[in-house]
Design a protein with these regions (language model features):
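Active-site phosphate-binding and catalytic loops of NTP-dependent enzymes
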Residues: 61-69
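Short hydrophobic/aromatic beta-strand micro-patches
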Residues: 39-41
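Short amphipathic alpha-helical segments
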Residues: 34-36
Length: 123
C-alpha cells in the first residue's frame, strides 16, 4: 500500500513518541468515510496523550487539518480524525479487546472444501 503524505507524517509522529505496534490499514474499499486507518499502542494514559499531541502538532505543521479528537481526557483510547486518515491511539488491553486490526482487515479468501462424492450403489 502506498501511503500518502498525511499518513506518512502521522506514522513518523507516532514513531517519534515510541508508539507501539503501529498498523496501517487501507480501508478505501470498506468505507467512504476515510481512506486509511492507523492503530497504535500506548503503554499509559500519559503516553497516549503525548502520541495524540505530537500527531496533531505534526499534522498542523504540514498544513493539514485536525477535524476532531475524542478520548484525550481519559487517554485509554484516543481517536484523532485527520479527514482521509483516522488514527486510534489505544492502550494495550483496550486494543486487544476491540481488535480493530482484525475487524477492519480485508476479508480473507475462503478455502473451498472438496465436495464429497456420493458412494456408488452396490450392484
Amino acid at each position: 500500500m502506498k501511503l500518502d503524505k498525511l499518513a506518512k507524517t502521522a506514522v513518523a509522529a507516532l514513531e517519534d513518541i515510541k508508539g507501539r505496534d503501529i498498523v496501517v490499514l487501507d480501508v478505501k474499499r470498506m468505507t467512504s468515510l476515510f481512506d486509511t486507518m492507523i492503530v497504535v499502542g500506548a503503554d499509559s494514559n500519559r503516553q497516549g496523550r503525548a502520541l495524540s499531541s505530537s500527531l496533531q502538532e505534526r499534522v498542523k505543521a504540514l498544513g493539514a487539518r485536525v477535524y476532531g479528537v475524542e478520548g484525550e481526557q481519559v487517554g485509554e483510547w484516543i481517536l484523532v480524525d485527520l479527514g482521509s486518515v483516522v488514527v486510534h491511539v489505544m492502550q494495550h488491553a483496550t486494543r486487544k479487546y476491540y481488535n480493530l486490526e482484525e475487524l477492519w482487515a480485508p476479508p480473507r479468501p475462503r478455502a473451498r472444501r472438496p465436495r464429497a462424492r456420493k458412494a456408488a450403489k452396490p450392484s
